[in-house]
UniProtKB/Swiss-Prot annotation:
Coiled coil: none annotated. The gene is ruvB. It catalyses: ATP + H2O = ADP + phosphate + H(+). It holds the Pfam family AAA_lid_4. Its EC number is 3.6.4.-. The lineage of its organism: Bacteria, Pseudomonadati, Campylobacterota, Epsilonproteobacteria, Campylobacterales. This is Holliday junction branch migration complex subunit RuvB. SMART domains: AAA. Residues 1-182 are annotated as: Large ATPase domain (RuvB-L).
Length: 336
């Protein structure tokens, strides 16, 4: 499948740009109000007690601000943050090297934490509970365990698949937060703030149009903003008006609902099944896509907006999908 403009993963060329647009203060972070409120209370209490924060877990679809909010937490706690991802921690020694380099109250952010191996989790448990690292040297009867004390730290885990976390690991997080999709008004505000940082003039209705097509996700909103800005530059326009915005978004293949070819192909597959559940493996084979991408990238927004139902037997298109695609259900078809 070709690269999607609404892909939820960070593209390689976007990393530095995303950092430059990342909010650094609570007042700059738009949305997730309930999470922000709870975190502000926890941070205030931890600072008054002069303690590290409880370990916390952020889960939800990609691109909703898990990393950004973790950076703000570190700044509010006036401490350092170490960023890594579970696939990078292959051996217990990798984790030990990270943990032993942390200072008191530092934050360790592990992305894709559901991908930690059971062996790594076993090393992590005493570190989370007792701030202690148990290192096994040797093997067999001669094996010895060396205990290394660690400074109090905060582990922030981020995952798109909370259901894949082992129960022992999940239970060790003192706080757990589900990241929600953003409203169009929140996304429009994010877009306008980003446009200011990019020194780009943008019309209100243009920001609203981009927001409407951003699938409730800031990462996609910022990507679309930058692509529309490219179209404006080519058109020799210093202003992103509605005409340029509509032309750009249509050329990018993102419709009024934020759907692209992959979304429509997915929904068509379900709708044409005429109420019969379609298994994930069948969908993946038909779309030539891996199951994880379908579950983590394509389905969450469609599911949240009522375009499909998940059952034990598979996925089923809803009447909303049939209406969108103008594919009648068997019940609505007549013999004449």
């Amino acid at each position: 499948m070709k690269e999607r403009i609404v892909n939820l993963e960070t593209l390689d060329f976007e990393t530095s740009q995303e950092v430059s647009l990342r909010p650094s203060l609570w007042e700059d972070f738009i949305g997730q109000e309930k999470i922000k409120s709870n975190l502000q209370i926890s941070i205030c209490a931890a600072k008054k007690r002069q303690e590290s924060l409880d370990h916390m877990l952020f889960f939800g679809p990609p691109g909703l601000g898990k990393t950004s909010i973790s950076h703000i937490i570190a700044k509010e706690m006036e401490t350092n943050i170490k960023i890594t991802a579970a696939p990078m921690i292959e051996k217990s020694g990798d984790l030990a090297a990270i943990l032993t380099n942390l200072q008191a109250k530092d934050i360790l952010f592990i992305d894709e934490i559901h991908r930690l191996s059971p062996a790594i989790e076993e090393v992590l448990y005493p570190a989370m509970e007792d701030f202690r690292l148990d290192i096994i040297i040797g093997s067999g009867p001669a094996a010895q365990t060396i205990k290394i004390d660690l400074p109090p730290f905060t582990l922030i885990g981020a995952t798109t698949r909370a259901g894949m976390l082992s129960n022992p690991l999940r239970d060790r997080f003192g706080m757990s937060f589900r990241m929600q999709f953003y409203s169009p008004s929140e996304l429009a505000l994010i877009i306008k703030k980003a446009a200011i940082k990019l020194n780009q003039d943008i019309k209100e209705e243009s920001a609203d149009e981009i927001a409407k097509r951003s699938r409730g996700t800031p990462r996609i909103a910022l990507r679309l903003l930058k692509r529309v800005r490219d179209f404006a530059l080519v058109k020799n326009s210093s202003l992103m008006d509605l005409n340029i915005t509509l032309h750009a978004l249509n050329e990018l293949g993102v419709n009024e609902l934020g759907f692209d070819e992959a979304d429509l192909a997915y929904l068509s597959l379900l709708a044409n099944a005429q109420g019969r559940p379609v298994g994930l493996n069948t969908i993946a084979a038909s779309m030539r896509e891996d199951e994880g991408t379908i579950e983590d990238v394509i389905e969450p927004f469609l599911l949240a907006n009522g375009y499909l139902e998940r059952t034990a037997k598979g996925r089923i298109a809803t009447p909303k999908t049939h209406a969108l695609l103008k594919i009648p259900t068997l019940k609505s078809q007549t013999l004449f």
